[in-house]
Amino acid sequence: MRNHEVTTTQPLLGPDGVLQEPGWSRRPLQLYRRADIKKRPTRIKEWDYYSVLSPSGDFGVCFTLSDDGYIGLQSVTFLDFKHAFEHTETILNAFPMGKLHMPTVSSGGSIRYCDKKLGMQFNLNFEQREIKCHFKNFYNGKPLRAQIFLEDPPQDSMVIATPWLEDPHAFYYNQKINCMRARGKVEFDGKIYTFDPATDYGALDWGRGVWTYDNTWYWGSGSGTVDGHRFGFNIGYGFGDTSAASENILFYDGVGHKLDDVTFLISDNYTDPWKFTSSDGRFEMDFVPIIDRAALLDVKLICSDQHQVFGRMSGTAVLDDGTKVVLKDFLCFAEKVHNKY
């Protein structure tokens, strides 16, 4: 099984702007510096994405703050799984190119965005992340407000450093943190939705890099409680040269259990059941969709075709020691995204 684990603290990029050590790690040992990148500022992409799901309350929210060079994308999603309802509002900004001052590390700093429609802030204090959001006209003239706290104790995460064969100065540096207990509330449409830290979790997708123009990727993530244990997973592929390592992993009580390849089996209709299978037999799942958060943007040189599907997963995952973890209707999401930008 491939999967080279990076274990040494070092600069992410060498003096030539090339990724020094492709592979994966349990925490961000490779140090990202925007100044080390040998590409135009319009090509640099930096983003923080949070998903917070409540299996007990049948709702969820997602938040994105990003600086993607010649375009910024700030986004909020509300999900009602009981009624299969979702709404997403996105604000696009032209040529941010570093103006958001995205932190160079995932373990510290704050990000703030404010305009006449949206105020959103991500804060990180000691072992706790805070999400604050006020979207004035989110849906049919109704605002959305949220204040959510995520516990972030020391635990394994999924960090990947991936190059592209066709461009030595392109790279994808990403950390996924799962299983962060959530508390707080969302106010929307006259209702208050409250997260219960006993059952509800958030996850972070922290990414920095320079991509090639045309990419399709697959990604899935889930966090929850199984038989009294914190359990989560991150699966995905399609992005860059993954010969050094996959980004497939299980999390069990804060410890990562690395997987090899996982394949998404998707029908043409994204709301039909999906299947997931693995080369090492350690992730075999059926997935029943609830909501397809579909989004299509096609504006000349910028094209994005997204299907982020939320649903419930059932099947078996196997830890490093052979322990089987059986999932039954485990709330999570999986996506297929094609981007040109």
PLM region spans:
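Structured soluble/peripheral alpha/beta segments that form catalytic or ligand/cofactor-binding pockets
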Residues: 1-341
